């Protein structure tokens, strides 16, 4: 259980939560299949294990792991449009009259209802770690929309969830640009070989570099011309590597082999033990990594009144 992406949310109040209370709350919002006429469903499922008795909350030390599953029926717009056109053409030819918008919309609704039970079903899961002692919720996603879906459903289940996206005092683009420009990152962070540069104008150019020496003259010329670094690949303390963007999304997170080997050793032969060991080691690593990252980026910003 290693997160591949990371969106960080700050709890703005103490979250008095224990595993039993969280388990009971999530049980009120379980994942379930789409009914024949439903476009989508969303709810919580067991992060580890299967079956009705698998817990919806995995607890390790004072960290909680939860998982939400979205199920949706995929009905391509082109299929609906083609079926609607065929129906409209049929009516206009047989009845010798024009089909206007109100009737067309009604026909479209009827077609959707007819096609829905036969539509393909897509399932996707999103994991999140709740760390009350750190005052953080960590979502394994690079999509703010997916994270908000999980958090809003968690809020409904709990009745309240005082949380906001974590922010820092200095604009991330300014810090990332400075790191590339000076060829040196702060603390135990090291610049790697990938970045994205954007012009400051809204319709300006974008330069994406991969497997490139970011200390090169070419990159420095882009910076001199006014481009800002909006994504940058970094390594931290020989433990993990990642890509950080200007919204503080951590993408393509990769834990170094030594950590993974340690988790395998700690987990033993049992599959659940392996998952628990990797989750625990990941969260302990995050407990060191995230404060270091926020400090390197200029410190966490605490909005007034919070």
Swiss-Prot record:
Its main location: cytoplasm. One of its GO terms (molecular function) is double-stranded DNA binding. It comes from the Bacteria. GO terms for biological process: DNA recombination; regulation of DNA recombination. It is found in: Cytoplasm, Nucleoid. It comes from Pseudomonas paraeruginosa (strain DSM 24068 / PA7) (Pseudomonas aeruginosa (strain PA7)). It holds the Pfam family RdgC. Belongs to the RdgC family. GO terms for cellular component: bacterial nucleoid; cytoplasm. Keywords: Cytoplasm, DNA recombination. This is Recombination-associated protein RdgC. May be involved in recombination. InterPro entries: RdgC. HAMAP family: RdgC.
């Amino acid at each position: 259980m290693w997160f591949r992406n990371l969106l960080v949310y700050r709890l703005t109040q103490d979250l008095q939560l224990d595993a039993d209370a969280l388990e009971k709350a999530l049980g009120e919002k379980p994942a379930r299949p789409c009914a024949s006429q439903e476009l989508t469903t969303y709810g919580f499922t067991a992060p580890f294990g299967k079956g009705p008795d698998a817990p919806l909350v995995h607890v390790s030390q004072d960290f909680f792991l939860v998982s939400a599953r979205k199920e949706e029926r995929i009905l391509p717009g082109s299929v609906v449009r083609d079926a609607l056109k065929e129906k409209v053409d049929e009516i206009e030819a047989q009845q010798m009259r024009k089909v206007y918008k109100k009737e067309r919309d009604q026909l479209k609704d009827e077609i959707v209802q007819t096609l829905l039970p036969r539509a393909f079903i897509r399932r996707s899961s999103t994991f999140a770690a709740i760390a009350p002692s750190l005052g953080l919720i960590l979502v394994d996603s690079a999509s703010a929309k997916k994270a908000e879906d999980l958090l809003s459903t968690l809020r409904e289940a709990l009745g309240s969830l005082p949380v906001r996206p974590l922010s820092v005092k200095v604009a991330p683009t300014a810090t990332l640009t400075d790191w590339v420009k000076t060829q040196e990152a702060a603390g135990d962070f090291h610049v790697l070989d990938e970045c994205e540069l954007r012009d400051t104008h809204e319709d300006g150019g974008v330069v994406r570099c991969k497997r490139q020496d970011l200390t090169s003259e070419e990159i420095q010329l882009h910076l001199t011309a006014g481009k800002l670094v909006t994504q940058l690949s970094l390594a931290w303390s020989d433990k993990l590597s990642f890509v950080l963007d200007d919204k503080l999304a951590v993408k393509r997170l990769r834990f170094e082999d030594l950590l993974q080997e340690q988790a395998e050793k700690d987990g033993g032969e049992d599959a659940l033990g392996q998952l628990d060991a990797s989750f625990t080691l990941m969260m302990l690593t995050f407990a060191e990594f995230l404060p270091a990252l926020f400090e390197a980026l200029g410190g966490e910003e605490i909005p007034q009144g919070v």
